[in-house]
From Swiss-Prot:
EC id: 2.1.1.77
Gene behind the chain: pcm
Protein name: Protein-L-isoaspartate O-methyltransferase
UniProt family annotation: Belongs to the methyltransferase superfamily. L-isoaspartyl/D-aspartyl protein methyltransferase family.
Organism name: Syntrophotalea carbinolica (strain DSM 2380 / NBRC 103641 / GraBd1) (Pelobacter carbinolicus)
One record GO biological process: protein repair
Cellular component, GO annotation: cytoplasm
Function as written in the Swiss-Prot or TrEMBL entry: Catalyzes the methyl esterification of L-isoaspartyl residues in peptides and proteins that result from spontaneous decomposition of normal L-aspartyl and L-asparaginyl residues. It plays a role in the repair and/or degradation of damaged proteins.
PANTHER family linked: PROTEIN-L-ISOASPARTATE O-METHYLTRANSFERASE (PTHR11579), PROTEIN-L-ISOASPARTATE(D-ASPARTATE) O-METHYLTRANSFERASE (PTHR11579:SF0)
Taxonomic lineage from the root: Bacteria, Pseudomonadati, Thermodesulfobacteriota, Desulfuromonadia, Desulfuromonadales
Length: 217
């Protein structure tokens, strides 16, 4: 299988055709080898139009959703961005092609180690991973020009708002465990925020003190 052709078709048919047009995002999606972020048995499906399992009840998001969420941050290049939920590392890799520095938080040690290994193997040297409860964000490195959350939350954790730079954007799925609305929050002033709904979505739960509890807890 020619993965470069599969990647080009993915971008043309799933990303551009659905309205994602930011050249920085399109170029990043073209450059990152998505198949390397899933198990080898799934490589043939890596560029298909659906999420894939990555272990520990987590998934790598659908390509369109990665592109759409990245575009929704309204990046120009050179920013500092926080990702909540490293997962496979794919979203962080896409962001790393655009911004100066990516800070990404993961609560599951196995996923964090695997993501670090893959990110290093594809040359993403501007990505820092922290193992912690993602609902706290990453206060020491704040403020951030953008924050993207790759798991669904029952509400917007206050730490994200506090760690957003003035003029910065937060993109987060908010709703119940089964379905959410993707929201964009813009910090328009020190104590001022605007919020808009972008689209309906479905993500794995954001687990943590200010998110969901583990099922069975």
């Amino acid at each position: 299988m020619d993965y470069s052709i599969a990647r080009r078709l993915m971008v043309e048919q799933q990303v551009i055709r659905r309205g994602v047009s930011d050249p920085l995002v399109v170029d990043a999606m073209m450059r990152v080898p998505r198949h390397l972020f899933v198990e080898e048995a799934l490589w043939s499906q890596a560029y298909s139009d659906f999420p894939l399992p990555i272990g520990e009840k987590q998934t790598i998001s659908q390509p369109f959703m990665v592109a759409f969420m990245t575009e929704s941050l309204c990046l120009h290049g050179g920013e500092k961005v926080l990702e909540i939920g490293t997962g496979s590392g794919y979203q962080a890799a896409v962001l790393s092609q655009i911004v100066s520095r990516v800070y990404t938080v993961e609560r599951l040690p196995g996923l964090a180690r695997r993501a670090r290994r893959i990110l290093d193997s594809v040359g993403c040297r501007n990505v820092n991973i922290k193992l912690t409860d993602g609902t706290f964000g990453w206060e020491e490195e704040s403020p951030f020009d953008g924050i993207v959350v790759t798991a669904g939350s029952p509400q917007i954790p206050h730490h994200y708002l506090e760690q957003l730079a003035v003029g910065g954007r937060l993109v987060i799925p908010v709703g119940n465990r089964g379905s959410q609305v993707l929201k964009r929050v813009v910090r328009t002033g020190v104590e001022k925020f605007s919020e808009e709904d972008l689209l309906d979505c479905r993500f794995v739960p954001l687990v943590g003190k200010y998110g969901w509890h583990e099922e069975g807890d």
